[in-house]
């Protein structure tokens, strides 16, 4: 059993034996359209490490999308989405894609598609990043187009390419 608090709300969560095929992708960016990418510790199944935005699955079926986004950003980067100068926004975009074969064993039998909800997190340029060493080995800030080009997952690149529409929002 896990007790978690995000955004002033407490929740008791019972860990599930399998990952839930519902996840978030959070594009973290500055007002100058610099995008944060993190490098995964484990490779793509062929041994190659890859770059991505913050991602993560729901811990329980009814977990609200915003809570998942806040939890994953904090776990992976140490950034508090409710901190000074930060603005978390649900971009109301969803990607549905096949789960990569090398990761199917993490999901319940029969699960083959993942639904990914896209969020943006605007942060101040001085934000401090503290990586979780179990998940990531490096981070880097890139201009948004360059960041999109560096992403392993096509859905991640596509999400970053939507950034200009949200910069003025």
Task: State where each predicted segment sits.
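The catalytic Nudix box helix
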Residues: 53-92
